[in-house]
Amino acid sequence: MRKIMNWVLAATFICGASVFTSCTNDTGDNPTPESAKNRKEFIKHTRENLKDLAENLNFGSWEAANKINQEFNTTVLNNPEFEKAIIPLFIQKIREGVKPVEEGSELAALGYKQYATIDLTKFNYRFTMKEDGSGFDVEEADDFEMIINGYNPKTQKQEKGVRKLTLQASGDTYKQLAKRLGNEELAVVILVPSDFAFSIASMVPGSMQEVFIGAFKNNVKLSGKSEYMNIKTDAIGITGVISSNFPKIKEGNHAADATALFFSIDNDPVANESGMKFTFSHNDKSMIELEAAAKYTKKDFDFSQFITSKSILDVLVALVSGGSLEGSITLNEDLTSTLSINDCGKMIQLQREMAHARRNYADQATIEGYTKQLNEIVSAKMSCKGVNQEIPMKLKTEKFGVDYWAMPAFNFADENGYVSFTELLDKESVEYAINIVDHAAEPMAGAIVTVRQLLQFVQTFLTQMRVSQAQAQAANK
């Protein structure tokens, strides 16, 4: 499944088409005669955008930021020593604030006798990793800080205190109940802040330099069923940005590299609707923008999978299977392709079967059968700046190398009908497209994973498991 989705992402860049594949059915295309006049303009825009992206995409700082994020993932999220260091602090906070539950309250109705509140805006400690990595020294601080050991490229050695994460929590707070273990009578109420800002600094000669910064905001719309936030019943939206800024380096002739990823993620479990938007910017210029809005049918879909699943693509597949999807991709704020899928589950199944058949050297008739079915459930079109026309698209079976493929094709309302992108683009443009896929696909996927892991760290350094463990230990003392 993951390979199929990665192929789809690759196809997106090659044809400037869509998040999945670029295709439409013939019904309702109705291309106008004016479209033919725009054929050269669309081809010109496509070639120019592919060339510009291929020559200017620079993921150096993203890749470095992703590596630093992986260090924190290993050192913190998967480190039992961090568990040992943070749980006593939870226990202390819980013990300090235990109060009796008021009669007639929601907590009383749930069977709790006592409760304690932990305010994340005031949970500020500095965790400094010991030199041998055996644990953490803990002290109070103005913000939540982590100082860890890591690899110093200057000395090419593992060193103490070469990375520092600073987390600031502020804004409004939402009440959330920690997961309950068994029939405990002590409730732990977490006050989750609406605003988070963070930075990751790396040691350079003489001082710490911020190489990775970001911020995000939680927007929660309570369903009214409870005063406590529940992502399975309440609408939640997360917006933010992560960015890195590497100055020009004389050695190696590295140019200045400022990159940013703007993201927006929302889910409404009542309306069964979800949306995602990612904008990749380089040196203050928007390069690639991905947007998707899904209507899903799974009533029990858990949006928390976004920050716990191994792959963001797996989450998207789980979300839209059996539902519908509206999506778009924009290159250089110029060339935009939009698509509509009325049955995502069927589309994914057909893509999987077609890919398997193609790898087994299926004949033209076999691939044509899949092409026809895909065109019945997926529609797409393309537009670009300065041209007041939308060009309809669909899949067309074409031979590519030794295999038959379902290729995106465009209709410019002339005698040629639908023409596949391999016929429209010159050899150089196709080469640029392959360069983009080769350079961009993996770093972009890594950047999205970094967003997910940062949300996981920021929102769950007080994970349900840790709070539950602290709650159980505190209650038994």
Question: At which residue positions do the language-model features occur?
Answer:
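Extended terminal
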Residues: R39-I43, E353-K477
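C-terminal motif of bacterial Sec signal peptides marking the signal peptidase cleavage site
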Residues: S18-S22
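Acidic, serine/threonine- and glycine-rich low-complexity intrinsically disordered segments
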Residues: V204-I377
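Acidic/polar, low-complexity intrinsically disordered N-terminal segments immediately downstream
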Residues: T24-V162, K427-K477
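Short, solvent-exposed loop/turn motifs
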Residues: G135, Q158-K160, S286, M347, ...
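Long, acidic/polar, low-complexity amphipathic helices and coiled-coil-like
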Residues: K99-S281
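Bacterial N-terminal signal peptides that target proteins for export
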Residues: M1-L9
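Hydrophobic alpha-helical targeting segments used for export or membrane insertion
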Residues: L9-A17
